[in-house]
């Protein structure tokens, strides 16, 4: 604990590049050390973190979500151009001073990212459709394949894309699904209803 405190001494900005549960854990530790530190979360879903932020009375945080990445995790898979020409969603939930938000957005712009400002609710709803639901479908598709089928022999481009997505860190995505469960339930029901409509055409 003391070592962690020494690492953040005199820091004015900390970017939280971790999973949702680790972000909450780190915020719980960091908030008691220096209330002047500005926190920046990079999580894919904001609901769980925001619920903690509200309950803990943390005001000095901004959510930014870079729309980039890969199914591979870990520093060994790092890429210097990961954020170049990629969109970054900026969500200011605490009405931080304009200059604070601007400074964070400048950091992203300096590495080639494009800034999109959005409300928390819109972020959770839009990203459910464009990211969270597709990952859920990919995981479900892999669970649906007969175990006797040799995937390596009989799969082409379509299934390989499902395989790639399903190789994403399951713990990370379990956190995301849980955090955005309200929207994900709605999206899943829409998907299931459309699937049944297609199945009816087979009759």
Annotate each PLM feature:
Residues 2, 35, 112-113:
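Short phosphate-binding/catalytic loops that engage adenosine nucleotides
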Residues 3-8:
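Short, small-residue-biased leader/transition segments that mark boundaries at the very start
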Residues 14-15, 40:
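N-terminal Rossmann-like NAD(P) cofactor-binding module of classical short-chain dehydrogenase/reductase
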Residues 17-19, 43, 92:
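Glycine-rich, N-terminal phosphate-binding loop of Rossmann-like dinucleotide-binding domains
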Residues 24-76:
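Rossmann-like NAD(P)(H) cofactor-binding subdomain of soluble oxidoreductases
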Residues 30, 76-82, 174-175:
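Short, flexible, solvent-exposed loop/turn segments with mixed acidic/basic and small polar residues
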Residues 80-165:
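Internal alpha-helical scaffold of NAD(P)-dependent oxidoreductase catalytic cores
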Residues 150-203:
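Interdomain hinge/lid region at the active-site interface
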């Amino acid at each position: 604990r003391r070592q962690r405190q020494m690492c953040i001494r005199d820091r004015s900005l900390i970017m939280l590049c971790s999973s949702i549960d680790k972000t909450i854990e780190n915020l719980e530790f960091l908030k008691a050390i220096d209330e002047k530190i500005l926190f920046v979360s990079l999580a894919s879903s904001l609901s769980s973190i925001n619920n903690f932020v509200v309950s803990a009375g943390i005001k000095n945080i901004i959510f930014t979500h870079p729309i980039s990445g890969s199914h591979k995790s870990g520093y060994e898979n790092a890429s210097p151009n990961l954020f170049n020409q990629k969109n970054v969603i900026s969500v200011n939930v605490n009405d931080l001073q304009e200059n604070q938000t601007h400074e964070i957005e400048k950091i992203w712009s300096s590495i080639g990212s494009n800034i999109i400002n959005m409300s928390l609710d819109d972020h959770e709803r839009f990203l459910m459709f464009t990211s969270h639901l597709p990952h859920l479908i990919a995981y479900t598709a892999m669970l649906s394949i007969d175990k006797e089928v040799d995937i390596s022999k009989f799969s082409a481009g379509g299934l390989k894309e499902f395989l790639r997505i399903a190789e994403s860190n399951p713990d990370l995505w379990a956190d995301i699904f849980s955090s955005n469960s309200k929207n994900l339930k709605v999206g899943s029901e829409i998907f299931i209803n459309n699937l049944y409509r297609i199945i009816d055409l087979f009759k």
